[in-house]
Structures are given as structure tokens and as C-alpha cells.
Design a protein with these regions (language model features):
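Short, aromatic-rich amphipathic segments at membrane interfaces
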Residues: 576-593
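Selective detector of the "anchor" transmembrane alpha-helix that sits immediately C-terminal
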Residues: 589-612
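Short, charged juxtamembrane terminal tails flanking transmembrane helices
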Residues: 616-622
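Short amphipathic, basic-aromatic surface patches that mediate peripheral association
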Residues: 477-486
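Short, mixed charged/polar active-site loops
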Residues: 469-471, 509-514, 602, 606
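Short, aromatic- and cysteine-enriched interfacial helices/patches
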Residues: 61-64, 585-590, 613
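Extracellular glycan-modifying ectodomains
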Residues: 2-473, 488, 492, 502, ...
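Disulfide-stabilized netrin-like
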Residues: 493-577
């Protein structure tokens, strides 16, 4: 076999690489500026943190502090999302991840990122990891685009050495939905699935020129057929939306330009389609028509959730709000939006497409308003003439709402005839990698074996007016992990925590553990309750979670599966005797690894300079 001569491809194809030259002084100047740019921020942060006397986290030192408590927390959070992780002690990978997360949380990062994003969006018309900037001022949620272009729900992604071995465990949509359908069927309940087409499916012309609507994933139709084959009453809205789109006047649209969601008019039309499907059921005539309503047309403004993903501070200064004429649905008896009714034969499960125009925190709300009452749930209840049992969670349409329904009580579930499950179609179409990036998790749910009291007259109450029905002291046993609030499509979130009961001060409670939901973050900022750690003893003033209107529909980070009554904490706080006293923590403790590292760097520099000096002295003079 003859030897092949290696050839330069540039010479072979007649291409000639460009030669760039620069003076020594220029190179030194640019090198120094570059080094200063990348070293000044971390140096300032390390110096600033090193000067603290009450609490201290110095990155350059903590990098060598392995293992530590934060590494344990990082491993615990990973294990909750993947049963494949068997190790009991944190590895170096856990440590590096924990350090990286703490560095990202640096205070100066926020202002730098904010200014950079402002320049990137205004000058280069680019978004970020969550937002894609389209044409004519339209913004698109990136996971919605990923749901149309990835492997999809039917073909598993190939494994790869480039994937994080500790990534959240992915469960395919079909087996999870099939099991949930079977669980409902065993209880005599029918499932109606309403996948809501996301904005790029219906308005792709604003994403890029030349794309025709409707835009579908290649496996979407096959997926829907498989779901129908399970006995699911699947409502495909695509054709209806395209018909309505054809009748639009110039300047009108079915979705909001700067928001993920549909317009109020589109929502009302979809509610009418779903209501007609429900009314066609043979048992609908026997449903108690127990809801009389009055309506109120108002105009509301909202800048859009995707604008909030691009800029956290004062989005209204640089972006124009969109105006919507909405119709509030109010219970004639109470003057408030229709309350969720545990005794209803119809349950509605949904994500933010159900919450928009109802939950003030995700748009179109007024200061001090706890519920708008113009969303999908209120509109559907009006059309059906009956109260619904409603479970919603922003970003939690795949698992959280099913889990909440399954845990609502054995007698509550068995009373149902129909579950209407409204979910963004992207969650049905995402494959593993984009699904994990979007925080979408598909999990099986366990149905509660407890019976609960069902109120005769459903009435929602506001948390500020509620008096605690149970006051106890609990020791935190386990808690759910929270996503980065800067990377989520929702601005607020609760999280679940499991407490061992130490003492009951008020009320009766027979269980040894309590499942409590606390605030995780508000306005995309972590709050004091987020800092509770396993082992903390906490005094809790509790009310049943379903009674609290102010948290209805808000995302709930919940990766605990305990068949217990769910409470909301009105006033959580560490017991006085367990609060750590403020004290000076003493001088810095320098890890040995850091000392050896510095010695090695200094030795390397000295040896390098010595070699260079000797070579210059030995070089012959021309």
C-alpha cells in the first residue's frame, strides 16, 4: 500500500489563508485589556466577599472546599429528578456544579446581563435562550419552536457521551398518558385532552418569511391517532384556528405579539368548542346547573411574558403594552369569579393557557387583584352553567395538575364523570433534551386513598383574610427543588416541603407529617422562605391549600409524593430558639488545595521566566 502524502486543502483548492499582522505594542495593549476585562469582576467579587464578617462565600476558596453542604444539596436535588443516580456521597461533578451555580448568583451578574440583553435585543434584534425575536415585533417562546423541530414524542433521542449523565430522567409522554387514562377509566372517568397549538404553529409567518401555517411536528398526527386509540376524546384545535385566522381583518391575530398565549377572543372561541363537546355527552343533561353568572367587559393592558424574560426591570419603559378587551365572569351570588368545586362531576386541568386572563401575576391583572375571572375556566363554567373542579399550574400542565387532581381525595375523584385536560401542545411534542431545558417533566401520579370533606357551597377566599386553621411546629424533613427564576416563563412559584410534626399549637392533626406549600420566589426573586434547610424547626400557621385564591394557578414546584392533606403556610418562620445569632465568623480559612495551587502557579511562572532569561543570555549576539 503506497503512502499517501498529506496535502494542505487550502493549496489543493486554490484558496489562500489570509495573513493578519499586528504590532507588538498593539498585541500587548489588547492582551492586557482582555485580561483586565475577564479578571476584574471575579477579583472584586472575591475581595468583597472576603471582607464580610457575618456570612461569607469566596469563590476562589470554595472551589477547593470539597466536599461541603452545598455539594450535598446539589446531589439531593439531582437524585429527586433521576432514579439512576445511586451514589450517596457528592462527587467532584456535584461540587463543580454547585460552585458554578453560586457564581452565577453573584449580584453584579444581574446588571451586566441586563445591559448586555438590552444591547443584543435593541441593536441586533436577538433574543435569548427562552425568547426568539420574530418579524414585525413578534416574540416567540423558544421551547415552543423546539417542540416542532426536535426528535418528538415517538422517536427516542439517541444517548451520547456529550449528555450530562446526571441529567433529569426522561419519561416518554405516551406511556405516562396511557397509564393516567387507565387510572381514570378504572374509576369510571372519561378523559378529554385539549392540546393547545402554540403560537409558531398558527402564526409562523411572523417567525420567518415564507413559512406556511399550520406548522406541525412530523409525528404530531401519528401521536394524536395513538392517543385517540387509547380511548381519549382528543380535541385538535388546529383546523378551527386556521378557519378563524382566515377570517381575521388586517392587523388582527389569534395570539398576542409579545406573550406566549392566545388572545381573549381566541380563548373564548376555544372554550365554546370544548363546551359543545361536553354538552354532547350522554350524561350532561343530569349535571346540576348550579352556576348563575353576570359578565363585565373591561379593557386591560399587558406588556407580555416574553418581554419579562428579556428584561426584568421596568419593561414598560421600552416596550408598548398590548390592549385586550376581556369579559369577566362573576358568580351572581358572590360577585367573585366562579369558585372551584370539589363536588363537580367535571374537572378541568390546565397550564398557563387556562390561567391567562385569570391569574393576575401572568398578565392583565390590577394591583391588589387576586383573580381576574376572564380566563378559560370561568368562561367554560359559564357556557356549561355549572361549577368545575379546577387545577392549574403555570408551566406544570404535564404532571403537576394531574398530581393535584389525583391527590384531591378519593371521594372527590370518584365523583367525576369527565376530566378536561388542557395542555400546551409543545409539552406533548418535546423530546428529552429540549424537554429538560424547558423544565417539562412527565411522571406517573398516585391517586389518594383518603376521603375529604366536600363543601356544599364552593367559595374562594383571599389569603390575607384567612385565619390559620392549624398552627404547628415542624422539622423540615424534605423539600422540593426550585428552578432558576430568571429562566422560567413564570414570575412566581411555590414549593412543597415535608415536615415532621414536633408540636401542634392550634387545631387537630392526626398525621405525623405535614405537606406544606411555601413561597419559593416572587417577581423572579428568591425570598426568605426559600432558604429553609432540612433540619430547620419552623413554626407554621397553615390553611388548606385549596382555600387560598391568591395562589390559585401559580406554579408549584412539587417533586414529593406524599398522600397527605396539602396546606399553605401563611406565616412560616424559624423558631426563635433555633435562629442563629449574628456573630463574627472569624478570619478566612484557606484550603490546603488553594495554597498548593498558588504555590504551583508561582513556581511555574518563576521557572518559565528563568528558562527564558537563560535562553536569551545563551543566544549568540548577531
Amino acid at each position: 500500500m503506497s503512502e499517501q502524502k498529506m496535502e494542505n486543502p487550502y493549496d489543493k483548492f486554490g484558496a489562500h489563508p489570509c495573513k493578519v499582522t499586528a504590532g507588538r505594542v498593539s498585541l500587548w495593549i489588547f492582551s492586557i485589556l482582555f485580561l483586565l476585562g475577564i479578571s476584574i469582576p471575579p477579583i472584586l467579587r472575591n475581595v468583597n466577599d472576603a471582607k464580610k464578617t457575618e456570612s461569607r462565600w469566596v469563590p476562589v476558596l470554595e472551589f477547593w472546599n470539597f466536599p461541603n453542604a452545598k455539594d450535598d444539596d446539589a446531589l439531593a436535588a439531582k437524585k429527586k429528578k433521576s432514579s439512576k443516580i445511586k451514589r450517596t456521597e457528592p462527587s467532584l461533578r456535584d461540587h463543580l456544579g454547585a460552585v458554578e451555580n453560586e457564581i452565577k448568583a453573584a449580584g453584579f451578574c444581574k446588571s451586566i446581563a441586563k445591559n448586555d440583553q438590552k444591547i443584543i435585543t435593541s441593536v441586533f434584534n436577538e433574543g435569548n435562550l427562552k425568547v426568539t425575536v420574530g418579524r414585525d415585533g413578534w416574540y416567540f417562546y423558544q421551547p415552543g419552536i423546539d417542540g416542532l423541530a426536535g426528535y418528538g414524542p415517538l422517536k427516542a433521542e439517541p444517548d451520547s457521551v456529550t449528555k450530562d449523565p446526571d441529567r433529569p430522567e426522561w419519561f416518554a409522554q405516551l406511556p405516562v398518558i396511557e397509564k393516567f387514562t387507565k387510572q381514570l377509566r378504572e374509576r369510571g372517568i372519561e378523559l378529554m385532552l385539549v392540546p393547545v397549538p402554540v403560537k409558531p404553529m398558527i402564526h409562523p409567518e411572523f417567525l420567518s418569511e415564507g413559512i406556511k401555517a399550520p406548522l406541525r411536528h412530523r409525528d404530531q398526527e401519528a401521536l394524536y391517532e395513538k392517543l385517540r386509540g387509547m380511548g381519549i376524546d382528543l380535541v385538535d384545535l388546529t383546523d378551527d384556528l386556521m378557519t378563524w385566522k382566515a377570517d381575521l381583518n388586517e392587523g388582527e391575530a389569534l395570539y398576542l405579539k409579545q406573550d406566549t398565549h392566545w388572545t381573549h377572543d381566541t380563548m373564548e372561541r376555544v372554550a365554546a368548542v370544548v363546551a359543545e363537546r361536553v354538552k354532547a355527552k350522554s350524561w350532561y343533561g343530569d349535571v346540576a346547573k348550579n352556576l348563575e353568572v353576570k359578565t363585565e367587559s373591561v379593557k386591560r393592558e399587558w406588556v407580555g411574558d416574553m418581554v419579562n424574560m428579556l428584561t426584568e426591570d421596568s419593561p414598560g419603559e421600552n416596550y408598548s403594552a398590548e390592549t385586550q378587551k376581556i369579559v369577566r365572569v362573576l358568580d351572581s351570588k358572590t360577585g367573585a369569579p366562579p369558585a372551584s368545586d370539589l363536588g363537580s362531576p367535571i374537572a378541568l386541568l390546565g397550564d398557563s393557557f387556562v390561567n391567562v386572563f385569570d391569574t393576575p401575576s401572568i398578565g392583565f391583572g390590577k394591583d391588589g387583584e387576586t383573580a381576574i375571572g376572564a380566563g378559560f375556566a370561568a368562561t367554560l363554567a359559564k357556557l356549561l352553567g355549572t361549577h368545575l373542579q379546577v387545577h392549574t399550574a403555570n408551566g406544570g400542565g404535564a404532571t403537576d395538575v394531574r398530581k393535584a387532581f389525583a391527590g384531591s381525595g378519593k371521594n372527590v375523584v370518584e365523583n367525576k364523570k369527565l376530566v378536561i385536560w388542557t395542555i400546551a401542545s409543545r409539552d406533548l411534542l418535546l423530546s428529552e433534551t429540549p424537554g429538560n431545558k424547558a423544565g417539562v417533566m412527565w411522571r406517573d401520579v398516585q391517586f389518594s386513598k383518603r376521603d375529604v370533606a366536600i363543601p356544599e357551597n364552593p367559595v374562594d377566599e383571599n389569603a390575607p383574610k384567612l385565619e390559620p386553621t392549624l398552627i404547628l411546629t415542624g422539622k423540615l424533613k424534605e423539600r422540593s427543588s426550585l428552578d432558576d427564576p430568571k429562566q422560567t416563563p413564570y414570575a412566581e412559584s411555590l414549593y412543597s416541603a415535608l415536615f415532621d410534626i414536633v408540636k401542634v399549637e392550634k387545631g387537630k392533626y392526626a398525621e405525623s407529617e405535614a405537606m406544606v406549600f411555601l413561597w419559593g420566589f416572587k417577581d423572579r426573586k428568591f425570598i426568605a422562605e426559600t432558604k429553609l434547610q432540612v433540619g430547620d424547626e419552623v413554626r407554621l400557621e397553615l390553611v388548606p391549600l385549596p382555600a387560598v385564591t391568591t395562589v390559585k394557578g401559580i406554579n408549584k414546584a412539587d417533586d414529593l409524593f406524599a398522600d397527605l392533606p396539602q396546606f399553605f403556610a401563611l406565616k412560616p418562620g424559624l423558631k426563635e430558639e433555633t435562629k442563629p445569632a449574628t456573630k463574627v465568623i472569624g478570619p478566612l480559612k484557606i484550603p490546603c488545595g488553594f495554597i498548593f495551587f498558588v504555590i504551583g502557579i508561582v513556581a511555574y511562572v518563576i521557572i518559565g521566566l528563568t528558562i527564558q532569561f537563560r535562553q536569551r543570555r545563551a543566544a549568540p549576539v548577531a
